[in-house]
Amino acid sequence: MSEVRLIDSKNLEFSVRGDSPGMAYVARALTPDVSPNMGIGFARWEGAEVSWQVLYDEVVFVIEGCFELTANGQKYEVRPGQMLWIPEGTELIYGGHALFGYVVHPGNWKEIHGL
């Protein structure tokens, strides 16, 4: 049985997910072996724009700064105290300058999609 865990973003290893003209970093806080149902982590966006089609349902909640997401011709600016729900299959562009947390379901989406 899993235990309750306190996760501090300062203790995680962030990997690069985007580059020039800005940078983007992502740190997964729980691995699929801990929770295959949910993936959680932190991300820091520093002006990068990353295009993606999500293969999972996702919630993004902003801790500091302004996270930007463009989807279906609409641009969303998400600020501290706000969150954004993104349904599976959405084609989007992540952007902005922000530290944010994320939750994805299913957490083992890479395994499911053979990635």
Regions found by a protein language model. Give the residues of each.
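A short, N-terminal "cap"/entry segment at the start of jelly-roll beta-barrel domains
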Residues: 1-42
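Ligand-binding loop in jelly-roll beta-barrel domains
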Residues: 88-112
